[in-house]
Amino acid sequence: MVRNLRSSEPQKISRFPRHHGEGKKASSPALNLQWPGQKQVASAVAPEMRKRAPPKNNNTSIHRNCRKHLRKEGDWWIVEGGQNHKKAAHSPLKTKPVNKEGNRKKYGRPPREVEGKWLTSLIAATTEAVLRQLGKGKSPTAHTKSNQSRVPLQHSEKTAKGIKYATPQPKKKAHEQRKELPHWPPTKRSHGANKGQGAPVRAPAKTQGKGEEQPHTMRTWAQVAAPKKQKVTSKPPMAQKKKAQGEKKGAAANPFHWELQVEQLLKDAEQIRESMYIRFLHVRQSWWSTCFKAHMEFHCPVCGFAHPEETITVTHCRQQHPGGPPDSLHPDNNRESGAVSQVPPAHFRRWWLSSHIWRKRKISTLLSPKLPVPEQGDYPNARSGIGTGAPHSPHHCDRSAGPP
């Protein structure tokens, strides 16, 4: 920091400086580095340009020699030179005491040690003042006591004459005031607020940060429907088992619940089996009533069925034996024909069950390759082979009887 040694009084600067007395030698002319009308500024580089004009009246005015030098020592700027104030000889003036270091003045910032102590003391004093204000229940920017005691009431409590102020409350203790301190700094009063009244209390501004938002407690439907995730811990299985034993009784799975489910499934399977057997009996009953006639008489002596697809076979048989005995089967004959022996009775039972479960198969696709058209010589054998009782296959049940 450089000291500005600007002269306090304006002076005339000419090309040739004035003499301060007779017998004195005139100094060499100095360069005029200023514009006309500009004040002269002192400089540590050109001290000869800082000479002041002599006083107008030769009285007790002081003649000063302003030849001073400016140098820097570390963090200090030191100005040296110059003389003390002197008066005329007839009235001596008491001189001022000189500093121990001589006529030297220091400018600039103090040393680092002193600066550190000064900052520490300043911080400590400020902290102490703030804590003292907080202890009294006031913030550093709070209003005065007179303004705090005159708190205006709500708009509904204002009277016609003017504002009705609340009565000042008695002072509370220090620990009670600390509990009532706000968690946010008080807002500054606006410029348009009335100075005689306290500023209105404002709510703190809402921050936009995510950390300040309050989490909602309601769950979404996706969270409700989602299954609970099992907690995966790093503890050994024995420790988890001990922890599970100490839980509530309702937390463990009920084994009787699963046993009840199994019994229910078995019951359903049994009902399905019974219903299927009942359907089987209904189909067999309708087949018997359709195919059987009194005295063991059937439509066809070869197959014994009355199906529309077998009309060709029946017509062929009757054409081959126009004058033969009526188409009747007798159970007292155990002989089998070659055509019927290809399909044993057990196979007929399987076809009968499968055809009435799916209701998709037809007798033409099952029996046509296995039962060839009977010839004239095979007719007696066919009658005796089928005459073992009731037929063993329900493929040619009457469609008019309806579903079982």
Swiss-Prot record:
Zinc finger (C2H2-type): 300-321
Keyword entries, A-Z: DNA-binding, Metal-binding, Transposable element, Zinc, Zinc-finger
Biased composition (Polar residues): 1-11, 29-41, 141-151
Ranges of biased composition (kind: Basic and acidic residues): 98-111, 395-404
GO terms, molecular function: DNA binding; zinc ion binding
Region of interest (Disordered), residue spans: 1-62, 86-111, 134-251, 317-341, 369-404
Listed name of the protein: Retrotransposable element SLACS 45 kDa protein
Species for this entry: Trypanosoma brucei gambiense
